[in-house]
Amino acid sequence: HYQIGSIMVRILSFTDRPIDRTFWHERLKAAYDMRLALHLANSDTTNAYRLVHGEGDNLPGLIIDIYRNTAVMQAHSPGMHYARHLLAEALKEVMGDKLDNIYYKSETTLPYKAALEQENEYLLGGVGEDTATENGLTFHVDWLRGQKTGFFVDQRENRALLERYSRGRKVLNMFCYTGGFSVYSMRGGANLVHSVDSSAKAVELVNKNIELNFPGDSRHQAFAADAFRFLDEMTTEYDLVVLDPPAFAKHRDALKQALRGYTKLNAKAMEKMPKGSILFTFSCSQAVNKDQFRTAIFSAAMQAGRHIRILHQLHQPADHPINIYHPEGEYLKGLVVYVE
């Protein structure tokens, strides 16, 4: 199972057995059974979740996210790419009539050195986009043109936590993308919600999701703007801020630069936040560990001249399990801090 890149080898099994359709069926069924145990695959309020989280589900190099009756599959290694058709057949067997579409989206995730000329394609069905439900809220999911698999299911529990703190607050959601945090804060009773993203398409999408859940609600406004410039120029005193940027460090070589970026970003936000504010801040960079991220946030508070206290230490949800032999699978870390 050869991988061209920084990972020398990915291990599928420690026993001598054929890697065939039966093997894939067993692994996918184990992953599905766990999501049933987590009350995700059989939930009345959520139908967007991660079915396969690479090494965490003993399927290294494979990601599968479920959106209602569609599976979006990403291969991160040539081995999983070559097995895609067997995987699709096994997945349909496991999920049965709960699955109508399988979209294979690996153009940008396969190692470029592998020289695999792969176009994204349907392995089953062919629906272009759909809506998915998360904790009773509805979101447009466009796996054809959207980032990653179309939606960030890893923030589900953290969005629900934000909802609890939203009542009566002025919320700023930076790097909003689909606007998940914005939609939850609207339901939580925020007085005002502003969503910011550098992408005009993201702004269009967050507005679409707000209208889908809260038609005609004037509390929300979205802006297409550079994050640092927006923070420099903003005059509204937001007392609940979400900073969920894209990965600042995808490789260890970029670690120092990434930590400086997190410090700068969080310091700019803290400088403008009134006393008694709450900051949700995240890093999805594998190369940045929890201690390094926390140190960057403490440094940001010092630069901003603010005193902060940690209210919550956040991470990825249970449908993103971590293999004890693959600690890198724990990539999402976050802090909720009280700013004084």
Where are these regions (language model features)?
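Mobile active-site "lid"/loop adjacent to the S-adenosyl-L-methionine
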Residues: A224, Y238-K268
